[in-house]
Curated annotation (Swiss-Prot):
Site positions (Cationic membrane-docking site (MDoS)): 128, 133
Designated name of the protein: Basic phospholipase A2 homolog Ts-K49c
Region (Important for membrane-damaging activities in eukaryotes and bacteria) location: 121-133
Disulfide bridges in this chain: 42-131, 44-60, 59-111, 65-138, 66-104, 73-97, 91-102
Function: Snake venom phospholipase A2 homolog that lacks catalytic activity. It shows myotoxic and weak anticoagulant activities and induces local edema a few hours after injection (5-10 ug) in the hind paw. A model of myotoxic mechanism has been proposed: an apo Lys49-PLA2 is activated by the entrance of a hydrophobic molecule (e.g. fatty acid) at the hydrophobic channel of the protein leading to a reorientation of a monomer.
Signal peptide: 1-16
One GO term (biological process): lipid catabolic process
Length: 138
């Protein structure tokens, strides 16, 4: 459980329902979220959006954009619940805000799984100093 908390802090600062996000990533990829994605590329972890290094890094870029588009939500404080049913993430909220947050987190976890072939261990701990700003809009 401690590893999931550390992962969440690294992956998104303190945004979102961090325990659930960590569980989703592990369930979809089988990877330890903290050590595999916590500081990956230019977009995973704290900081703004930068030019993605690869498809895995783009998952984090899109996730940050997803959070940015949330309405009437506080991704830092709000929490949500979800279920793992037949190897699929099911967001279980009726309230729009937690459901939207859950859908953002579900999308990044699935994106990581779909792009496991682009995952590069050399980008696991990337110094953000060498990341370029992007003109790409969310």
């Amino acid at each position: 459980m401690r590893t999931l908390w550390i992962m969440a802090v690294l992956l998104l600062g303190v945004e979102g329902s961090v325990i659930e996000l960590g569980k989703m990533i592990f369930q979809e990829t089988g990877k330890n979220p903290a050590t595999s994605y916590g500081l990956y590329g230019c977009n995973c972890g704290p900081g703004g959006r930068r030019k993605p290094k690869d498809a895995t890094d783009r998952c984090c870029y899109v996730h940050k954009c997803c959070y940015k588009k949330l309405t009437d939500c506080d991704p830092i404080k709000d929490r949500y619940s979800y279920s793992w049913v037949n190897k699929a993430i099911v967001c279980g909220e009726d309230n729009p805000c937690p459901k939207e947050m859950c859908e953002c987190d579900k999308a990044v976890a699935i994106c990581f799984r779909e792009n496991l072939d682009t995952y590069d261990k050399k980008k696991k701990i990337n110094l953000k100093l060498f990341c370029k700003k992007t003109s790409e809009q969310c």
